């Protein structure tokens, strides 16, 4: 995203303040360090003052007085994931309020996410009422991931695309043709923190709207669209530089009618979102996207819904019945996907095993690419001295499975075991075992109860 160097510096300072940098130095030791490129001869990282102070080539280099975490030879240190498309989780969505948003940010860190865009949507009138309050959370400490701004996914979408590709029987949505005045009103309510906007280019004046977004320093994204290949090209010419959950919410790729997906695959100007959970996009097609775009033009996202973190079972989103299966997808009664509940660490396991993407490239797609796209590439998305100490650590976790009929392959049990945000450890897997694990299970049950069938809600309430 375009922006002045002074703007980047201000954002840098604000983001680092979220890390509460005071405290003793911390050393993380592991078998592999990906910066995201393999760091040959590096065995660990020293974090101090909220940033990466230096890379360590020997365990004896840990300074006196530092907290040392030896995470084992199978552990991999990567830049913290930056998810530009996540709506919520654990029964909550960002517009539910401050406490809800903080809970989502805290829990998202448990899978290795250190920064994200709060993805929201609604009518312009709705958004101007609750965006100011949410904007208070941007770049503030949360005890988890840092909110880096907003991704607006709606109202400027063709909701009929949901019907065309099966996610809903009817959209039930009022259509709002793109209007620059509406955008600036919403951006003012968001205190200038809208970074990414999804829109469908088939609306009247949509191309002019895309030009307006681009000139305002916001990344325009094509999504939830029935656009023809030529219209998709026109949208890119107008300023589109991002594609919302590629292959989903758009015409299926066909060799005689490639649709928007075909244009996204072949235009190097566009960064393509990928939901790599194995359900939204088959691993073979994940590999196709990776080979067509390369690791520098793909951004990994969860598109995590409020049902993220829910166990398998049947739930109700209003009148709509949904099923969470062992692949952690949210499935409708007709067998169509209506969102993902898969965390980013499981997604990475799918991508690097079934999808065949090397870990160093997966780390680039999950951290470096979104950091650069958001104008944060000078201090986030890499593990090098001077950059923010935003680090995710992945290692084999006994019993971790992919589900969804995916094979058990070497690396498919790799999950997040530690997350550091601006030099502060906000999550350690071993700290949630035992009694804390039981307390968390009770918390999760309370969150999911309201979405159960009435008879199940009554039964669980009696327990």
Residue positions per predicted region:
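N-terminal metal-binding scaffold of metallo-dependent hydrolase/deaminase domains
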Residues: 1-63, 398-401, 424-425, 454-455
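Active-site core of metal-dependent hydrolases
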Residues: 184-312, 331
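Divalent metal-dependent hydrolysis catalytic cores, especially in the metallo-beta-lactamase
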Residues: 87, 102-133, 145-159, 190-202, ...
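His/Asp/Glu-enriched, well-ordered alpha-helical/loop segment
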Residues: 262-272, 290-396
């Amino acid at each position: 995203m375009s922006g002045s160097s002074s703007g980047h510096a201000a954002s840098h300072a604000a983001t680092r303040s979220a890390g509460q940098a005071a405290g003793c130095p911390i050393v993380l030791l592991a078998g592999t360090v990906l910066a995201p490129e393999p760091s040959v001869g590096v065995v660990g990282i020293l974090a101090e003052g909220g940033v990466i102070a230096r890379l360590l080539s020997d365990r004896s280099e840990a300074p006196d007085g530092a907290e040392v975490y030896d995470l084992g030879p199978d552990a991999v240190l990567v830049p913290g994931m930056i998810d530009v498309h996540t709506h919520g989780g654990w029964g909550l969505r960002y517009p539910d309020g401050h406490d809800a948003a903080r809970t989502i940010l805290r829990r998202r860190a448990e899978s290795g996410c250190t920064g994200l865009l709060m993805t929201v949507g609604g009518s312009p009138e709705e958004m101007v009422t609750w965006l100011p309050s949410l904007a208070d959370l941007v770049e503030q400490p949360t005890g988890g991931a840092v909110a880096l701004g907003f991704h607006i996914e709606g109202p400027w979408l063709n909701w009929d695309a949901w019907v065309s590709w099966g996610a809903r029987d009817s959209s039930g949505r009022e259509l709002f043709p793109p209007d620059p005045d509406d955008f600036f009103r919403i951006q003012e309510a968001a205190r200038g923190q809208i970074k990414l906007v999804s829109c469908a280019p088939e609306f009247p004046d949509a191309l002019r709207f895309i030009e307006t977004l681009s000139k305002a320093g916001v990344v325009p994204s094509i999504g939830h669209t029935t656009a023809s290949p030529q219209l998709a090209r026109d949208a890119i010419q107008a300023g589109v530089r991002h594609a919302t959950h590629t292959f989903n919410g758009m015409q299926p790729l066909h060799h005689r009618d490639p649709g928007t997906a075909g244009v996204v695959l072949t235009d190097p100007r566009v960064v393509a979102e990928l939901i790599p959970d194995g359900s939204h996009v088959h691993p073979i097609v994940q590999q196709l996207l990776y080979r067509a775009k390369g690791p520098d033009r793909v951004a990994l996202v969860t598109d995590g819904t409020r049902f993220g973190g829910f166990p398998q079972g049947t739930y109700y989103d209003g009148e709509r019945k949904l099923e969470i299966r062992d692949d952690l997808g949210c499935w409708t009664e007709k067998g169509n996907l209506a969102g993902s509940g898969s965390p980013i660490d499981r997604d990475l396991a799918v991508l690097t095993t079934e999808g065949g993407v090397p870990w160093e490239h997966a780390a680039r797609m999950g951290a470096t690419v979104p950091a650069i796209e958001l104008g944060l590439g000078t201090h986030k998305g890499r593990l090098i001295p001077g950059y923010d100490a935003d680090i995710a650590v992945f290692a084999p976790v006994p019993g971790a499975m992919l589900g969804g009929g995916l094979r058990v392959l070497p690396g498919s049990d790799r999950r997040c075991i530690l997350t550091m945000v601006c030099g502060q450890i906000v999550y350690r897997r071993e700290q949630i075992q035992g009694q804390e694990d039981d307390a968390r299970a009770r918390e999760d049950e309370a969150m999911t109860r309201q979405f159960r069938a009435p008879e199940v809600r009554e039964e669980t309430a009696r327990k």
